[in-house]
Amino acid sequence: LQNLGNRGKGYSVRHGVGVASGAAIGFIDADDKTDISSLPTLLEELRGSYDLIVGDRTMPESQISIERRPYRQWGSDLFKYLVRYAVGLGEFPDTQCGYKLFRAEVARELFGRQRVDGYMFDVELLILAKRSGLRVKRQPVVWRDDPDSRFKPLSGSLRNMRELLAIAWRRPR
């Protein structure tokens, strides 16, 4: 798939979901931080009990091979606090883990209502899932931090805060 210009991660994933086929639709970050060896098991769980499975690095069973730099961890902790209290997603302490898997009809329904084009699209999706009463499973992951990440802490954090506040203000339905 190609976009004309950089429209944002949320836009790109929404575009991909729009053309995807199959009984399950998912996405994983392209930077190879998250191990996907559990995918066959997760697909079985989607066929049974769950509508959506989200990777969660905060779960005790998760295996983190490289710890984040302190300033990145502090920023992450502040973000989690805001997600919990500004948008009411306390039951999802790791909204930004780039490992999510949906039943296809659930993905189409959620992404049909999702509007955020940037990185905070995950937050909006989880709000929509929660308000729709979907069955969501948090899944521990095997994850490797990238000390050479292209994320710019100051400008990226400000952009993400703007998107997060817009989501909190708009209250997706």
Describe the residue ranges of each PLM region.
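Short beta-strand-to-loop acidic/aromatic patch adjacent to the donor-nucleotide binding site
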Residues: A23-K33
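Acceptor/aglycone-binding surface of glycosyltransferases and processive sugar-polymer synthases
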Residues: L4-V19, A24, S37-Y119, D146-S155, ...
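Acidic donor-binding segment of Leloir-type glycosyltransferases
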Residues: L1
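DNA-recognition element of transcription regulators
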Residues: V123
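Conserved residues at the C-terminal ends of beta-strands
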Residues: I28, D56, V142
